[in-house]
Regions:
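Conserved beta-strand elements of the Class I
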Residues: 24-26
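A broadly used, surface-exposed interaction patch
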Residues: 56-83
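C-terminal accessory helical subdomains adjacent to catalytic cores in phosphodiester-
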Residues: 1-4, 8-22, 34, 38-55, ...
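Short acidic, Gly/Ser-rich segments with clustered Asp/Glu that frequently serve as metal-coordination loops
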Residues: 29-33
Length: 216
């Protein structure tokens, strides 16, 4: 993970204010991923989690662009923390969420994430495999179209938007299926086999943030 490095110049504004872990999540997808992680955030009541998608003019959306955006936003928050002398404005963890698909920039994105302290989670072939694992086993290799077809069978009106009753509570079941499909895909900044995802690492991080929030 990427712990926040608090410069000596940063101070806590009040003695009675307890630290809360802040998490930044940058998604490659504009709709589904953002909607899912906002749902997870609400499910765990993890207030100090900020979720956004990569939307930078001239970059497009590919794994390298997502990692660059994660670095940019994290560093911007660090600068604000220094400027305002408030360590709580910085992020403790920064995550980027991408697919394998046919992206030529994925290997470069992994290298940049490792060198920049970004936790890059990668789904193969696409993020929807994680959603599908909330519902059913799916151990065999699949194309993105295969997964979308199977997900549409579970969600008849699925059009990238998740229903209000999506089973976020079944994330542990999805994690178990992901671990069974690729037992080695248990750390950020690596590619897994088809199918695979390590999104559960981020979901567990959001869950921890929610538990810490309740203890405040």
């Amino acid at each position: 993970m990427s712990p926040r490095r608090s410069p000596a110049s940063l101070t806590r504004p009040s003695a009675g204010r307890d630290p809360k872990k802040r998490i930044l999540v940058i998604c490659e997808g504009v709709v589904t991923e953002v909607q899912y992680f906002n749902g997870v955030k609400d499910h765990f009541k993890a207030l100090p989690v900020d979720i956004a998608h990569c939307d930078v003019d001239g970059w497009g959306r590919d794994p390298l662009s997502v990692v660059k955006e994660a670095v940019r936003r994290r560093d911007k928050a660090r600068s604000a923390a220094r400027r305002q002398r408030d360590a709580f404005l910085a992020y403790d963890e920064t995550w980027a969420v991408v697919d394998v698909d046919d992206h030529a920039s994925l290997d470069e994105a992994i290298r940049m994430a490792r060198g920049s302290g970004i936790n890059l989670v990668i789904s193969r072939p696409c993020f929807e495999i994680w959603l599908l694992w909330h519902y059913q086993d799916c151990p065999a290799a699949l194309t993105t179209r295969d997964i979308q077809r199977k997900l549409a069978a579970r969600l008849p009106n699925y059009d990238k938007h998740l229903p209000a009753d999506f089973p976020y509570r079944d994330h542990q079941r999805a994690e178990r299926r992901a671990r069974q499909a690729d037992p080695d895909h248990t750390a950020p900044n690596r590619k897994g086999r088809n199918p695979s995802t390590n999104v559960w690492l981020l979901v567990n991080g959001i869950a921890r943030a929610g538990r810490e929030e309740k203890r405040q």
